[in-house]
Amino acid sequence: MENFEEIINSKTPTLVDFYATWCGPCKMMSPLLEQVSKDVGNTARILKIDIDTNRNVATQYGIRSVPTLILFKEGKQVWRQSGVPSKNLIMESVNNFV
């Protein structure tokens, strides 16, 4: 992914969803992240990364299971969660860094 480093280095917190098209739990994340996106508006960004088409990025961040969410703020990893967390947990984590 060409602009990945630029995006995660911005001042706007960026929640990255590392997923795979064949992953059942990953499919459950999409509607959840759509709700989170509506709730956070422009205060945070949500980015989806397919680990099968972006293997270098997945390897760089040690993604071993999907879905994995990583929240970046100014290039630093500030929160990480594997599996399907609750919307409340995601919102709480994002709101801590906006």
Task: For each feature predicted by the language model, list its residue ranges.
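Short pre-active-site segment immediately N-terminal to redox-active cysteine/selenocysteine motifs
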Residues: 11-12, 19-22, 65
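Structural microenvironment flanking redox-active thiols in thiol-disulfide oxidoreductases
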Residues: 51-57
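Hydrophobic beta-strand anchors of alpha/beta hydrolase catalytic cores
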Residues: 15-16, 46, 69
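Typically the conserved alpha-helix immediately C-terminal to a functionally engaged Cys/Sec
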Residues: 27-40
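Structural micro-motif
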Residues: 62-70
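Non-catalytic, surface beta->alpha helical segment in thiol-disulfide oxidoreductase systems
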Residues: 71-98
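A short beta-strand-turn-helix
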Residues: 1-13, 55
